[in-house]
Amino acid sequence: MATENPNIVFIFPDQLRPDFLSCYGAEFIDTPNIDWIANNGVKYSRAYSAAPICVPARTSLLTGMNAIRNGVTDNQHFLRSDYRQIGIETLPEVL
């Protein structure tokens, strides 16, 4: 029997705060598609970031490693091209 992969959607917008989404109470904007995902999936009331800036935070989320360990400590660096060879796995690869 084949194993079915989970349906996981990560939305990685830059600088999007919950007060800019109608599913979190914003009244000046309608975000029906994100609202649908929030109402039919998982919606968080608290979030913590592994890094204070974008690229390291996203890389930490995808690798499960902090910025020092995965080597992405600022917005000018990205995950090494040989990350697989040095033993780093990303969430999509694990799933």
Where does each model-flagged region fall?
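Formylglycine-dependent sulfatase
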Residues: M1-L95
